[in-house]
Amino acid sequence: MGLSTVPDLLLPLVLLELLVGIYPSGVIGLVPHLGDREKRDSVCPQGKYIHPQNNSICCTKCHKGTYLYNDCPGPGQDTDCRECESGSFTASENHLRHCLSCSKCRKEMGQVEISSCTVDRDTVCGCRKNQYRHYWSENLFQCFNCSLCLNGTVHLSCQEKQNTVCTCHAGFFLRENECVSCSNCKKSLECTKLCLPQIENVKGTEDSGTTVLLPLVIFFGLCLLSLLFIGLMYRYQRWKSKLYSIVCGKSTPEKEGELEGTTTKPLAPNPSFSPTPGFTPTLGFSPVPSSTFTSSSTYTPGDCPNFAAPRREVAPPYQGADPILATALASDPIPNPLQKWEDSAHKPQSLDTDDPATLYAVVENVPPLRWKEFVRRLGLSDHEIDRLELQNGRCLREAQYSMLATWRRRTPRREATLELLGRVLRDMDLLGCLEDIEEALCGPAALPPAPSLLR
């Protein structure tokens, strides 16, 4: 049994040996040579690439801005490279057969061209100022405006690839990188953590308080303005007479009824006046205009001791004369107070240097608005007027008194008379003021010893 086993093992061995002997070259071809394997697996140095047809040759790569036109013919020989055409580029060393096409900025995504395409660089696209890039993919981006952080503060400034990071004020929450009022917050959103109910209650209380207080403030303001207006109107009625006296140099005209009430007896006829026959004067009418005479009887400085009538309080309004009366006046003119002083038998009265009452009477009866004109006509210069006003800046009355005292000192005593003041007041058309001065100086001596009540 052992002998039969041996022939069975020898048969396969013999067949294997025959196959090796018959096809030695075919078996050797199946396994590559060790040297060829090392060459095929070797890598070319940096800046070169393996020849596509001969692995043993390394060709030099083309520079950026060029492309491979033909491979190098052999080792140590140059590669045939050509420059890219317009609208194409290569951005690095390469052995590409064609240049890459230039990219275009997408206006629908808000992109703008930062730098144009060249043979060695692709088009550079970006965003405008105060914008950032939001990438939808690795190379696709869209431009959005940076958030202004309204109702909040900037935590991180806007960058090229990141929007502004905001921190919202109290009563606002962040939604899509914008600070939105808590009134727009719903219970289902996360904003309920930031918008607390207490804040809403406080805000509601403030709004209700403002709603109540605002109408009250407006109402009381209108009431205050109304009271102020009424007070001014009441004051105006009291100031009206004083203002009229200051501006016009005479009292305000009274109503006709009041004027008739003050007329208690008819006027004494003037001996020098003879009216035209048939002329009948009306009640309260004076043939002499009010700008020249008043309603009082004829008066001269020499008659002061015998003057018993009370001081004039009102002056009748000016009334124009009829044609007949005008003819009578032209034929027989009535003298004015200044003419009566000049025609009087008495000599002109000089101002008493030791008695300041005379100067104060002039100060009180000349209108303040006409005062500077008055003292200029007396001979004072503007420099002297300003100096005396500064010396008595707190009291206008004392300043005016000082001006008259200065005029009196520089004027000879025989010339400082009421006649001179009367001429100046006549030139200023202020004869009414002159009569007031006369009454102020002569009135106290003419009062009766036992005063009687006026009705």
UniProtKB/Swiss-Prot annotation:
Cystine crosslinks: 44-58, 59-72, 62-81, 84-99, 102-117, 105-125, 127-143, 146-158, 149-166, 168-179, 182-195, 185-191
Membrane-crossing residue ranges in chain numbering: 212-232
Membrane topology: Single-pass type I membrane protein
GO molecular function ontology, one term from the record: tumor necrosis factor binding
Extracellular membrane side: 30-211
UniProt domain comment: The domain that induces A-SMASE is probably identical to the death domain. The N-SMASE activation domain (NSD) is both necessary and sufficient for activation of N-SMASE.
Listed GO CC annotations: cell surface; extracellular region; extracellular space; Golgi membrane; membrane; membrane raft; plasma membrane; receptor complex
Chain positions carrying an annotated carbohydrate: 54, 145, 151, 376
Organism for this UniProt entry: Homo sapiens
Descriptive protein name: Tumor necrosis factor receptor superfamily member 1A
PANTHER family reported in the protein's UniProt record: TUMOR NECROSIS FACTOR RECEPTOR SUPERFAMILY MEMBER 1A (PTHR46861:SF1)
